[in-house]
Amino acid sequence: FGIDAVHGQSNVVGATIFPHNIGLGAARNPDLVRKIAEVTALEARVTGLDWTFAPTLAVPQDDRWGRTYEGYSEDPAIVASYAAAVVEGIQGKVGAPDFLGPRRVLASAKHFVGDGGTFEGRDQGDAQVSEAELRDIHAPGYVEAMRAGVQTVMASFSSWNGVKHHGNRSLLTGVIRDRWNFDGFIVGDWNAHGQIPGCTNEKCVAALEAGLDMY
């Protein structure tokens, strides 16, 4: 099963806790975050986990967003430079003998996409931006995570121009599956599918039809 071990296996007393992502981003050191991800993966694995919901690849554009600290930077280039390092630290490098080996767990690139760009920084809000801005500001980290072989992607609670990401087929299927050729697993966030019009937490055909594999 999976859990939020984002900056260390913080769910277990005695595990190693590292600075949160905003602090790690200030270090401007991909090699450091790779090593941190390796430790996090190992301590997650020995506590019985197979999957961590990390890395967070948000690109916060408004400091009023209450989850700004979860992003590495407001600069998409910095976020992109960290994405592959964290994914490879968690899972290992594709083709290497230890890829998804006994010291590794599955990574999850989250929260797709634009959660750091919502109007007025509102949590679970609406990113009222153009397709070009969504692509150029908020997506580069995901592209690098895909190149590094990330096995899962988590959809965001937020919306893009009024459409909830959990029900946005043009993004979940059109971009992730068709454009980026991702053949891994797309997972929902905590009952976020229930916010799609016509859905409940218990039932949401629209999310599955949009491309979500599990909610």
Named regions from a protein language model:
Residues 1-215:
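Glycoside hydrolase catalytic-domain context in secreted enzymes
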